[in-house]
């Protein structure tokens, strides 16, 4: 069981901004998973809440990953920045998928490089 966070690397976000966007994505995906499959969430919590952070280099890649996760019925989230600091309002910044079985997520994100 794991969660994968996908961050856009093409936006020039500072490290703190990337962490914040990833945090937003994690919370939203967790809430989605809690609704869809509470037993999977409980298992993930017991196993130590494994998270992996990877990167993409475009909005298109981010949207494609999100759409694949949704089409597979996986818990997921996509984050649009509010535009208060570094980015324009509505900029897509991050996706989180899971918690779910590793192999289900790897099917979608296994080719991506670690951030």
Curated annotation (Swiss-Prot):
Can you say where in the cell this protein is located? Answer: Cytoplasm
Q: Name one Pfam family in it.
A: PTH2
Q: Which UniProt keywords apply?
A: Cytoplasm, Hydrolase
An example GO CC term for this entry is:
cytosol
Sorted alphabetically, the Gene Ontology BP terms of this entry are: translation
Return the Gene3D superfamilies for the record: Bit1
Q: Which SUPFAM superfamilies match?
A: Peptidyl-tRNA hydrolase II
Q: Which reaction does it catalyse?
A: an N-acyl-L-alpha-aminoacyl-tRNA + H2O = an N-acyl-L-amino acid + a tRNA + H(+)
Tell me if Hydrolase is a UniProt keyword of this record.
yes
Task: List the HAMAP family.
Answer: Pept_tRNA_hydro_arch
The family classification in the record reads: Belongs to the PTH2 family.
Entry protein name: Peptidyl-tRNA hydrolase
Source organism of this protein record: Methanocaldococcus jannaschii (strain ATCC 43067 / DSM 2661 / JAL-1 / JCM 10045 / NBRC 100440) (Methanococcus jannaschii)
Gene that produces this protein:
pth
